[in-house]
Amino acid sequence: MRSIVTRWGTHLAVCLFVLPISVSAAGLADVVGEGQIRFLKTKPDPNSYTYESKVTILETSLDSGLVQIQTCHKKLDPIRKVVILFNKDRIRDIQVRTMDGIAMAEVRDNRVTLSEVQKGGSICIDLQSKALDSLGNGLYQLNAGPLMRRLFDGYLPMTANMKFSWPDKLLAVQETKPASQDGVDIKSANDGLEMDLVFAGKMTAQILLKRSD
C-alpha cells in the first residue's frame, strides 16, 4: 500500500509514490535526488500525475483561519491501494466530490483510502481546514507543500495548479515563493492568485498576504 500524505494546516503536503513500470523514459531523464528541486519549462510526460487545488478565503477566515479547499489528484498511477492522509488537527468535513477509474474510496477520520486505482484514475476531495495563519499587523500566510512525486530515493516531474481566491480587494499579495521563473507561472488579481508549476523534487510554495486598508 502506498500513501499520499496531505496536511492542510500550516502547510499542505502531497507525496505520491509511483511504480517504475509506469514511468516513461522522458520522466526518468528529469529525476532529481533528495534535497534537490528543478523547475522545468515543460512537462516531460504529458500523461503523468497532476495535482490541482483551490483554496477559498472568506472575510471570516481572517479571524477563524478556516478556509474551504477543493483538491484533485489526476492521472494517477495504477496501484491496488493508496491512502490520502490529512492533518487531523486542522481538517474537518472531508468529502469525496468525484472519482473515476477507482473501485472504491473510503473516508474515515482524517484519511481517504482508495482501492484498485487504474492508470489515469482521478479523485477530487473537498474539505475545510484551519489553514490561514495570522502573522500580525494584517499579514497572513498560506504554505502549500511539500508537493512531491517519489520514485525510490528520487523525485519525478509533476505539475501543480493551485488557485487561491478571496473577496475583491480583501487581500493583497505581498510575496510568493517560488517567484515567477521557468516552470513557475503566477497570475495575481484583486480577488485571488493562481500558480502553475512544473517541477521535479520536493516543492514548498509560500504566499504572503496583507489585508487591504
State the predicted function of each range.
Residues T10-P20:
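Bacterial N-terminal signal peptides
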Residues V112-D182:
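Surface-exposed, acidic/Ser/Thr-rich flexible loop segments
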Residues F17, A25-T60, M195:
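N-terminal, polar/Ser/Thr-rich
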Residues P44-D45, T56-L66, L85, E116, ...:
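Short, solvent-exposed beta-strand/turn "edge" segments of beta-rich domains on protein surfaces
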Residues Q95-N143, N190-T204, L208-S212:
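A surface-exposed beta-strand-loop module
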Residues V67-K75, I125:
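Short, well-ordered beta-strand segments enriched in hydrophobic/aromatic residues
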Residues V32, P78-V107, G154-G183:
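Solvent-exposed beta-hairpin/edge-strand motifs
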Residues M1-T6:
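N-terminal secretory signal peptides that target proteins for export/translocation
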